[in-house]
């Protein structure tokens, strides 16, 4: 959860909340925003916070705003926080879309995923990193990159038993960074 939080919310040069780590690179939320050159920003209804009654219209509006070169990408993905994801699923369920099956929601280690009805190549992913945000981002998942320096883990890893709390604890110091390949492939509603 902490890594996912960092991957999405890091701001270069700022100390990450709840830690002593100063981020050296921006997270996806900063990289895929209206302040980044070429990122498309949703307009109209799609630029507002997702509500159950308008979720489908808002998401399809973001698809309409996407670069035509990626609309048929096999991994086109909406990224959002878990609470926004729940509103989307609730909205799709209450709209009684004949081709939406709420039992298709998958839980994958703290992430949730469901296909977007009517779009066989589009999934909606709710994750920890955007949990306190109304931000919704659309783009090809394969164009988002996370890098790390895992080769140094053996020298930066500590494991110990804490007798006071009767727990095994560990500390791992490594570098973690994010990047997108093509900013113009992404659409953001640009909400906080």
Write out the residue ranges for each language-model feature:
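Short, flexible coil/linker segments at or flanking structured domains
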Residues: 16, 64-68, 73, 112, ...
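Short glycine-rich, low-complexity/disordered patches
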Residues: 5-14, 72-76, 100-108
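Sequence/fold signature of self-assembling virion shell proteins
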Residues: 25-52, 87-192
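Internal mixed-charge
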Residues: 2-4, 82, 126
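Alpha-helical scaffold segments that mediate packing/assembly in large oligomeric complexes
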Residues: 1-64
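Ordered core of a single globular domain
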Residues: 47-96, 104
């Amino acid at each position: 959860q902490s890594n996912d939080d960092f991957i999405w919310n890091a701001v270069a040069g700022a100390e990450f909340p709840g830690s002593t780590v100063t981020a050296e690179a921006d997270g996806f939320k900063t990289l895929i925003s209206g302040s980044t050159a070429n990122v498309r920003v949703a307009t109209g209804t799609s630029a507002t916070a997702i509500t159950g009654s308008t979720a489908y219209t808002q998401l399809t509006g973001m698809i309409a705003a996407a670069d035509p070169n990626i609309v048929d990408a096999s991994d086109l993905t909406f990224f959002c926080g878990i609470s926004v994801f729940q509103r989307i699923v609730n909205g799709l369920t209450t709209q009684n879309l004949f081709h939406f099956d709420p039992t298709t929601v998958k839980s994958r280690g703290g992430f949730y995923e469901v296909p977007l009805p009517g779009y066989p190549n589009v999934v909606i992913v709710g994750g920890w990193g955007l949990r306190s945000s109304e931000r919704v981002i659309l783009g090809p998942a394969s164009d988002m990159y996370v890098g790390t320096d895992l080769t140094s883990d053996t020298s930066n890893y500590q494991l110990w038993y804490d007798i006071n709390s009767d727990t095994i604890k560990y500390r791992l110091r490594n570098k973690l960074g994010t990047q997108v390949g093509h900013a113009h492939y992404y659409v953001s509603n640009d909400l906080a």
